[in-house]
């Protein structure tokens, strides 16, 4: 179905506005009706991939763009022609802004990359953004930090977020936060030491279907949630699991919570399956490499006692519209954290997601034995 056509659910969401839509979805958002006298100044930081920059880091260009009021679509076509259609049809289409985007009280003021030339195109596409020559320079003029990492390994995360955390600035640190369990714990403990609100998670946490799933779980209407199966459509490789395996694990963590006991993973060619076990809950499943008829990136199945609930990121058949929605919810939650200084994601969940990913890799390396999470937690 063409999202530009009449879509009942989309029209319903649009007709009630962002606040009404989010109320229907069972989530809350800090109101944006009365902009602050001084807009929140956001500094974006781009992580590297093994020391190499990410010139069109989608976790900044796509995810964070709603935090800035202005986008020059002509400049976008010049610098990012591949993404022009997504921006014009969805991300910067006033018909699909959830009566909220771009936020009236936020501005991206600086873009930092270890290679300053990489930041220049972003400043031309989003007028008003400056190239930060150093983190120290950027931190003098921002109220919060967004560190985006689309495909990196996380080994540079601490160095990129620590200066802002040391100043107590609310910070988003992308996955895979810190790279390994020790790196994740180091960032979490540093943030806590400096009383700096920290957010780290997967955008899967904010899919429209996930919000419905959480509402079903919390209502108790369909009985106990007995099993979650979270699937990633892309073909599997072990290096890919270390980065993108975070997503299905985050789906399980979002629905079932922390307290994981052990993990076992098996692979066959370009697919893998991992079982995540709890001492007091039913085991759950992740699948990296599910075949698909239509690419929608992922699918999650919830098995309640009385109901099976299945969802993908798509809304009314449109992946791009659903992708737009989950990014909106992600940055809306970040904005709310900046305003309230209340962390939206428990630190234990963040730590256990990293541990699960690494325990699964350890399981695979050791003939797919069951690996206790304690073995990798240190």
Segments predicted by a language model, with ranges:
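NAD(P)-binding Rossmann-fold cofactor-contacting core
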Residues: 70-122
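Beta-strand-loop-alpha-helix segment that lines the small-molecule cofactor/substrate pocket
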Residues: 142-145, 151-202
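C-terminal helical cap and adjacent loop that interface with cofactors, partners, or active-site loops
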Residues: 314-378
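Rossmann-like dinucleotide-binding domain that binds NAD(P)(H)
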Residues: 229-295, 348-355
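N-terminal export signals
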Residues: 4, 11-32
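C-terminal segment of N-terminal export signals and the immediately downstream linker at the start
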Residues: 27-46, 51
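A contiguous active-site-proximal alpha/beta segment in oxidoreductase catalytic domains
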Residues: 177-238
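Short acidic low-complexity segments
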Residues: 97-101, 130-141
